[in-house]
């Protein structure tokens, strides 16, 4: 079995190793077969066959949703919707300050620029997009009858529970609240890609090059990776200028460094 070893390094690399472990857990990868950790805890290895066959894009998005989803705006919106529906169904709906604030929260968060961009990306891949379109045209307000609010909120709840909606809206929060702390200006964080499919951008910029690296013959490669010393081809050289400045001046450095 051919293995690829990953050793600790600076802050960003170590954070990446922790992230990789989260992804492997989500993939239910077999320890000792697909990956492993040395006895002294100073090395993680990956089975090269596993690397080439894994759907890294799906695993990455799945890990982000699973680990950060409960801390995002999406979760807050779902809780507000559930609370409002419960009050109406139990005949305790009395639109006061709390109720008005809940409706405003739902409107504001779901109609934010990032959520609207996310909707545009997936509107042809989901069911009942008209639910979101209706919200854009007519926001939820406390002056609506309880029956109308119940119908609107119930449809909105079902709409948001769709896996594609859940993943897209959670990722919009994760991207700007977590990922953006470490890198920017590349893939789905490149401004010109804001309205493009996030999965497609991640696959093109990260997953596909990662797999190709392990399928490429490096016997004639003249350059070496700055981190592990392994040979890399000219096409595999990756600028790390998109990384945030945490301990290094990334803006001025270009190398075949893999984050």
Where are these regions (language model features)?
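Conserved small-residue
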Residues: 1-196
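Basic, glycine-/proline-tolerant helical and adjacent loop/strand elements
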Residues: 160-259
């Amino acid at each position: 079995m051919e293995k690829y070893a990953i050793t600790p390094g600076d802050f960003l690399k170590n954070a990446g190793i922790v992230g990789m472990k989260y992804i492997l857990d989500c993939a239910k990868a077999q320890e000792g077969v697909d990956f492993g950790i040395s006895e002294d805890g100073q090395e993680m290895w990956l089975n090269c066959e596993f690397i080439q066959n894994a759907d890294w894009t799906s695993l990455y998005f799945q890990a982000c949703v699973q680990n950060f989803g409960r801390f995002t705006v999406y979760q807050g919106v779902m809780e507000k919707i559930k609370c409002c529906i419960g009050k109406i169904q139990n005949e305790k709906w009395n639109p006061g300050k709390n109720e008005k604030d809940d409706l405003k929260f739902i409107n504001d968060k779901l109609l934010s620029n990032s959520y609207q961009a996310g909707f545009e990306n997936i509107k042809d891949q989901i069911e009942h997009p008209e639910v979101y379109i209706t919200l854009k045209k007519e926001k939820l307000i406390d002056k609506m009858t309880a029956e109308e609010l119940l119908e609107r909120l119930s449809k909105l709840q079902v709409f948001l529970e769709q896996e594609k909606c859940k993943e897209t809206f959670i990722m919009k929060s994760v991207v700007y609240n977590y990922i953006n702390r470490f890198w920017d200006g590349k893939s789905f964080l490149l401004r010109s890609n804001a309205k493009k499919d996030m999965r497609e951008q991640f696959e093109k910029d990260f997953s596909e090059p990662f797999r190709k690296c392990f399928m490429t013959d490096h016997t004639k490669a003249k350059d070496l990776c700055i981190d592990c010393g392994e040979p890399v081809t000219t096409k595999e050289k990756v600028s790390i200028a998109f990384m945030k400045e945490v301990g290094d001046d990334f803006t001025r450095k270009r190398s075949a460094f893999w984050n």
